[in-house]
A protein has these predicted regions:
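Boundary/entry segment of secreted carbohydrate-active catalytic domains
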Residues: 1-18
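A short alpha-helix capping/helix-coil boundary motif
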Residues: 1-3, 36-40, 106, 212-215
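Structural preference for beta-strand elements that scaffold enzyme active sites
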Residues: 2-6, 33, 67-71, 135-140
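A short, structure-level motif marking secondary-structure boundaries and short turns
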Residues: 6-8, 43-45, 112, 219-220
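Active-site beta-loop-alpha junctions enriched in small/polar residues
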Residues: 10-12, 39, 75-79, 141-146
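Flexible, glycine- and charge-enriched loops at secondary-structure boundaries
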Residues: 12, 16, 49, 53, ...
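Aromatic-lined substrate-binding rim segments of carbohydrate-active enzymes
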Residues: 20-101, 116, 123-131
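Polysaccharide-binding and catalytic clefts of secreted carbohydrate-active enzymes
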Residues: 100-125, 129-228
Length: 228
């Protein structure tokens, strides 16, 4: 089977006057695919609810008419500052409890419901607008999912979500979970670490010495489930 080659392209970085020439040169080099859009949330939605698709429409059309297949990325790895201003508690925390702030990418906690809702909104709008576009031949969900150790967060939001996850993993009567089943599974008789209810459970960091390995394992499994 013949292999095809592609390239990442960021039309939002360049003046529109050079897009056609860029597309032509890509095709002349033998490229078949072009990925765009994965970091362009702010360009697509400058402020909440105000969308600018015109530049993206034009870029996709130019690339497609040049004979290139477009891979459209969802821009969910780079929420704009206005998202953070709306949800200041959406930032993740590292194992030392330090906030991982705005200024690069992946500045959010996967557990945060507000961030999730904003992602659903922009992804849905992109899908409706470009889902049947003949030049959009593939989609990329997010970008480098979980890199920079961002699957793990020690924020209060993550703690609350972890407690909910544990209640489902160790079910009891109703929605309260079985805390004794958790204590037994984690071996919490050691070092007097037994809990009386799930709301007592914190994240496995900032302890005097090594946290309970079973606690760490469940926290890692919870974190993995969030991005599964």
């Amino acid at each position: 089977m013949k292999q095809s080659l592609g390239v990442c392209y960021y039309p939002e970085h360049w003046d529109t006057s050079i897009w056609e020439n860029d597309a032509r040169q890509m095709k002349e080099l033998g490229l078949s695919w072009v990925r765009i859009g994965e970091f362009a949330w702010k360009e697509i939605e400058p402020t909440e609810g105000q969308f600018n698709f015109e530049w993206l429409d034009k870029a996709i059309k130019i690339l497609g008419q040049a004979g290139l297949k477009v891979v459209l990325g969802t821009p969910t790895a780079t929420p704009p500052k206005w998202v953070l201003d709306k949800y200041p508690d959406m930032l993740s925390k590292d194992i030392n409890g330090n906030i991982r702030g705005f200024g690069s990418r992946r500045h959010y906690c996967f557990s945060h419901s507000g961030y999730i809702e904003q992602c659903k909104d922009i992804v849905t709008r992109l899908a409706k607008r470009y889902g049947k576009n003949p030049y959009v031949c593939a989609w990329q969900t997010d970008n480098e999912y979980g890199c920079h150790d961002t699957t793990i967060s020690y924020s209060d939001t993550a703690r609350d979500a972890f407690r909910t996850w544990l209640r489902y993993k160790y079910p009891g009567k109703g929605n309260d979970g079985d805390i004794e089943a958790l204590n037994k599974e984690w071996g919490n008789v050691f070092w007097s670490m037994k809990y009386d209810n799930f709301d007592e459970i914190n994240l496995p960091n900032l302890t005097v010495t090594e946290p309970n390995p079973a606690h760490i394992l469940d926290f890692r499994r919870f974190s993995s489930d969030q991005v599964a």
